[in-house]
Each structure stands twice: as C-alpha cells, then as structure tokens.
Amino acid sequence: MEINEYQKLAMTTLNPALSQKDVLINSVMGLCGESGEAIDIVKKWLAQGHELDKEHLAKELGDIAWYLAEAATALDLNLEDILEANIEKLKKRYPEGFDTHRSLERKKEDI
C-alpha cells in the first residue's frame, strides 16, 4: 500500500463532526496515548520479565500510524511529503549514515 493511500483510507474513519483544530488536538493526544501503550509493552518486556508481545506492539504501531495520518490531514499535508522531507533532513545530518560524533556536535537549531 502506498503511504498516501493509507492516509486517505485511514481518514475515512475520522469523525467528520470534528473541526480542523479538534482533529489536530485529537491527533496529538492520540499519538501520545498510543505511544504510551507501546512504551508499556516494551517496559514490561524490558523490566518486568514479560515476553515481548510483538503482535500487540504491531497493533499499537498501527494506531500510531493512524494518528500520524490524522495530524498530517489536520495540517493539510500528506504523509509521503512529510516522510520524504524527514529522509532529506536525515541525509543532510548523517550523509554517511549515523555517526555518534555528528550526533554529539549537532546544533540546537537542527531539528
């Protein structure tokens, strides 16, 4: 599936009664909530002796993707453009791949 196709299909389940502002707020809160659920799965694996529940984690990652698509939609952006811009930023930051020295020397304004 193409990224923008996912965004379009995912947004068919968006509440149409929400304003653009409410969609953005909901998306950011949803990203935080679902990220917390993913963190909890990893925490239980890392610190509490549980097996890593990959199936559950994959479902939470899917929910995170949905809220990311919602945020992009609220901003009238498409995910493909966001992801391409992110890769371009990372290529400039780490042209030869990740480098600890370059990471440590990163300037504060390099977001």
Please provide the spans of the model-predicted regions.
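Flexible "arm" and connector segments at domain edges
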Residues: 1-61, 65-111
